[in-house]
């Protein structure tokens, strides 16, 4: 008989409740290359030993339940159970531990981020024996990675489509995010693109509201793209948000974008859901559309240090589900992001192979093999004075997105776009000449203002603007 259906002779069924650690805490277990490995930050309830808490996480996120059941005898628990194979205290925190759990690959449906999360985090976070629980990191084995298509195109294919190399890409979120008519919205897009930006963007909550229905917005934005391309000789794009109330409506919007011939669409992957996102990513690959991903709602899940899911896990999940861009924080702007930790998950988005590095919050070595990379998008409270730091921190393979930092220019959208493009080109040239952007950044920007009145005006407006708050996302 196969191990799945084997009934164990001579083993009597004993009803009752027993400690999880007797079955699910296995410190001698040697992890397999095919296991999915998880690092959980566990805060047990008073009186619950850390080994029992870690074993409870392994049990409740795999084969276990609160009591012994007779049907355990109809399967092979050793084959299918999750195992807590390590416990370590969290430095500087009282009663917090990192519990390492290994899951057999047979527990997961191929190519389904939805199923992976339903299994690993679907139920266990409400478990009473735990005061708090946070999923810090996952190691996705190569065998599972290969069941995913991943990003529709990836970094190199995107550069080839846009014919843009050797620098970060520049974007802008159209503001005000809500309330503009479709025609005025398209006008704002055109002015930004003709001023020198590569992309403009729908904000995450621009879908199809009474003041601007999606079809009207798509048409006016497409007109703006083609007009700006004709004037500048550069390929332009606007992230047309296809997020909708149903998957069918989302696909209808993506199909219309393809018919218009625009290069890129957008999806809110957490509010829209992983199933919808993966479906859209498959369509985008099959039809030559780039896919920009917004992470709206992420801070609800990832901001608390002791409970939830760290964004590095959500970033890995997005790379598997599919997206060519994703917002990643800025380090220097108005939104959350500590430098080393942010760069840790930026590498997890872009690189093929990432070594374990606890100083950056990376708990496991991750091999993505042939899965395409994702461009990180720095967006939120950034302006021209931040350009040297952003160029130095994120490098060429990134999108730098200035919403208010473009549209807030005193002379209008197009001069705001000019200011950002001049600042970026000055920083890239200075870096290529061997200058230190971190040390000489302000001087580089001041030198560039001599040749660009638009940049000089932007520098004057935002010279005092800073967002200096302590990051919550620390090790």
Swiss-Prot record:
<feature type="active site" description="Proton acceptor">
    <location>
        <position position="294"/>
    </location>
</feature>
<keyword id="KW-0560">Oxidoreductase</keyword>
<keyword id="KW-1015">Disulfide bond</keyword>
<feature type="binding site">
    <location>
        <position position="295"/>
    </location>
    <ligand>
        <name>substrate</name>
    </ligand>
</feature>
<keyword id="KW-0602">Photosynthesis</keyword>
<dbReference type="Pfam" id="PF02788">
    <property type="entry name" value="RuBisCO_large_N"/>
</dbReference>
<keyword id="KW-0007">Acetylation</keyword>
<feature type="modified residue" description="N6,N6,N6-trimethyllysine">
    <location>
        <position position="14"/>
    </location>
</feature>
<keyword id="KW-0456">Lyase</keyword>
<dbReference type="GO" id="GO:0016984">
    <property type="term" value="F:ribulose-bisphosphate carboxylase activity"/>
</dbReference>
<feature type="binding site" description="via carbamate group">
    <location>
        <position position="201"/>
    </location>
    <ligand>
        <name>Mg(2+)</name>
    </ligand>
</feature>
<dbReference type="InterPro" id="IPR020878">
    <property type="entry name" value="RuBisCo_large_chain_AS"/>
</dbReference>
<keyword id="KW-0479">Metal-binding</keyword>
<dbReference type="InterPro" id="IPR033966">
    <property type="entry name" value="RuBisCO"/>
</dbReference>
<keyword id="KW-0460">Magnesium</keyword>
<feature type="binding site">
    <location>
        <position position="379"/>
    </location>
    <ligand>
        <name>substrate</name>
    </ligand>
</feature>
<feature type="binding site">
    <location>
        <position position="173"/>
    </location>
    <ligand>
        <name>substrate</name>
    </ligand>
</feature>
<feature type="modified residue" description="N-acetylproline">
    <location>
        <position position="3"/>
    </location>
</feature>
<feature type="site" description="Transition state stabilizer">
    <location>
        <position position="334"/>
    </location>
</feature>
<feature type="binding site" description="in homodimeric partner">
    <location>
        <position position="123"/>
    </location>
    <ligand>
        <name>substrate</name>
    </ligand>
</feature>
<dbReference type="InterPro" id="IPR000685">
    <property type="entry name" value="RuBisCO_lsu_C"/>
</dbReference>
<dbReference type="GO" id="GO:0019253">
    <property type="term" value="P:reductive pentose-phosphate cycle"/>
</dbReference>
<feature type="binding site">
    <location>
        <position position="327"/>
    </location>
    <ligand>
        <name>substrate</name>
    </ligand>
</feature>
<keyword id="KW-0601">Photorespiration</keyword>
<dbReference type="GO" id="GO:0009853">
    <property type="term" value="P:photorespiration"/>
</dbReference>
<feature type="binding site">
    <location>
        <position position="204"/>
    </location>
    <ligand>
        <name>Mg(2+)</name>
    </ligand>
</feature>
<keyword id="KW-0934">Plastid</keyword>
<dbReference type="Pfam" id="PF00016">
    <property type="entry name" value="RuBisCO_large"/>
</dbReference>
<dbReference type="InterPro" id="IPR036376">
    <property type="entry name" value="RuBisCO_lsu_C_sf"/>
</dbReference>
<dbReference type="InterPro" id="IPR017443">
    <property type="entry name" value="RuBisCO_lsu_fd_N"/>
</dbReference>
<keyword id="KW-0120">Carbon dioxide fixation</keyword>
<feature type="propeptide">
    <location>
        <begin position="1"/>
        <end position="2"/>
    </location>
</feature>
<dbReference type="InterPro" id="IPR036422">
    <property type="entry name" value="RuBisCO_lsu_N_sf"/>
</dbReference>
<comment type="function">
    <text>RuBisCO catalyzes two reactions: the carboxylation of D-ribulose 1,5-bisphosphate, the primary event in carbon dioxide fixation, as well as the oxidative fragmentation of the pentose substrate in the photorespiration process. Both reactions occur simultaneously and in competition at the same active site.</text>
</comment>
<keyword id="KW-0488">Methylation</keyword>
<dbReference type="GO" id="GO:0009507">
    <property type="term" value="C:chloroplast"/>
</dbReference>
<dbReference type="InterPro" id="IPR020888">
    <property type="entry name" value="RuBisCO_lsuI"/>
</dbReference>
<keyword id="KW-0150">Chloroplast</keyword>
<feature type="binding site">
    <location>
        <position position="203"/>
    </location>
    <ligand>
        <name>Mg(2+)</name>
    </ligand>
</feature>
<comment type="subunit">
    <text>Heterohexadecamer of 8 large chains and 8 small chains; disulfide-linked. The disulfide link is formed within the large subunit homodimers.</text>
</comment>
<keyword id="KW-0113">Calvin cycle</keyword>
<keyword id="KW-0503">Monooxygenase</keyword>
